[in-house]
Structures are given as structure tokens and as C-alpha cells.
């Protein structure tokens, strides 16, 4: 259970193998401060990436972001304006949910 109203989950894959899972959380992190996140709290993308074993960094990685509301309905989970630049550098493909399903970030 994620103790937040907006529940974001980030999954990192390499060749269809799940390598890391992250969630938005109240925990602070120095990298979150460097990126400029409000209150220095980690977004799900950063949480997943920091948990990714170092041996996989630099490989072709896919990020999948999912968000759901309290009724477990899919909602918009596109990376925010602070996450997008570094995610585009790190991931070869980025997918996210919206109210209608899943989309690929272009």
C-alpha cells in the first residue's frame, strides 16, 4: 500500500526483464534536491533508477510509469517536467498511462 493519494509506480525493464520498481514516496534524497523536486521527495522514476543495479546502467532500458487513483482507475503518469530530461537521457523507451490506457512518450 502506498500512503499517498496519487499512487505512481515506475518499472524498469531490460529485454522484457523487470529489473527495478519504484514508487513516489515522502523519503528525501540528495539527487531529488539536485533535480529540484518539491520538498526533496523522490518521484517514482528516481526511486526505481536508484534501486537499479549498477551493472544494468547504460544498457537499453525501458521505463513504464503507472498511476492509479483511489478507485484503482488508470490516470496520467507521464514523467513531469523535472523527470523528463534525465529520463530521456537514461531510457531508450518510456511508456506511461493516462485515463485511456498506455502511451509511448515521443
What residues fall within each predicted segment?
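Zn2+-dependent cytidine deaminase-like catalytic core
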Residues: 20-106
